[in-house]
Regions:
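Short, small-residue-biased leader/transition segments that mark boundaries at the very start
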Residues: 1-5
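Acidic, Ala/Val/Gly-enriched low-complexity intrinsically disordered segments
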Residues: 9-11
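Active-site loop-to-helix "anion-binding N-cap" substructures in soluble metabolic enzymes
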Residues: 13-276
Length: 276
């Protein structure tokens, strides 16, 4: 009976620690529009999100990441609101003869606050490596942008049981190079690449398992600061599954793809956080 009592007390203590850590982290819903919408459509989408934002608790931080061509219009549409704007990528260099590139300084000058770096599509289609991403991270920080750094394994890596190793490498080769001050400004997003467009589904338990592992890796390098780092789920997050995902201890929000293109769905996802 004594052992049972001790276990119950410990369970209560762990639950209190979980609630404290979970509640002190930012709740973030970030929309990655990818290569979708035309500029006027993007502005209309931003205006719709803004018009209905008050339906969701002010404790939820909304970020929209439209294509480069939309940034000026979207930033203007969201001016004086609490909805932040981010870019989907930035150059690894600060300026010069890099045709087609957009620098972090340019993004910051427009009014961007965030930038997505290391997205699985950038890694897969454009061959982005840790070496490139280290340079992009440096550019982001040098210009006052907060990176949303993406990690995740593909189907082959998941089925081979290498998912922990892949994510660990992606963290160690880039995030471990940050100073404590830079780390404090970083958001992590986990993308289960194997569950995106494959017909396979990542469960909330699978999401929590890898999110907890990511936080453990971060804690090994940065200590207690890792408990304050938001870790977003970048799988197929929708209004229907957001509550189950966001209830998990180490899931602090979502990096949203398709559902971010409809204002109602995007905002509904923000309602998925547990109530205190």
């Amino acid at each position: 009976a004594s052992d049972v009592y001790k276990r119950q007390v410990l369970a209560c203590i762990y639950r209190l620690i979980y609630l404290k850590n979970k509640n002190m982290r930012k709740k973030i819903v970030a929309g990655n529009w990818k290569m979708n919408t035309l500029p006027a459509e993007g502005v209309e989408l931003a205006e719709n999100i803004r018009a209905n934002r008050n339906q969701v608790c002010s404790c939820v931080n909304f970020i929209v990441c439209p294509p480069f061509t939309h940034l000026g219009g979207v930033i203007e549409a969201l001016r004086s609101s609490d909805i932040e704007v981010g870019a989907q990528n930035c150059a690894a260099e600060d300026k010069g003869a890099y045709t087609g590139e957009v620098s972090a300084a340019m993004l910051a000058a427009l009014g961007c606050r965030y930038v997505i770096l290391g997205h699985s599509e950038r890694r897969q289609y454009y061959g982005e490596t840790s070496a490139t991403l280290n340079k992009k991270m440096a550019q982001a920080f040098a210009n006052g942008l907060q990176p949303i750094y993406c990690v995740g394994e593909n189907l082959e890596e998941r089925e081979a049981g290498r998912h922990f190793d892949v994510v660990k490498t992606q963290i160690e080769e880039v995030i471990y190079n940050l100073t404590p001050a830079q780390f404090a400004r970083t958001v992590i997003a986990y993308e289960p690449v194997w569950a995106i467009g494959t017909g396979k589904t990542a469960t909330a338990e699978q999401a929590q398992e890898i999110h907890a592992y990511i936080r453990t890796i971060l804690r090994e390098k940065f200590g207690a600061a890792a408990d304050e780092t938001p870790i977003l789920y970048g799988g197929s997050c929708k209004p229907s599954n957001a509550p189950e995902l966001f209830a998990k201890e180490d899931v602090d929000g979502g990096l949203i793809g398709g559902a971010a293109l409809k204002a109602a769905d995007f905002l509904a996802i923000g309602k998925g956080f547990p109530q205190k």
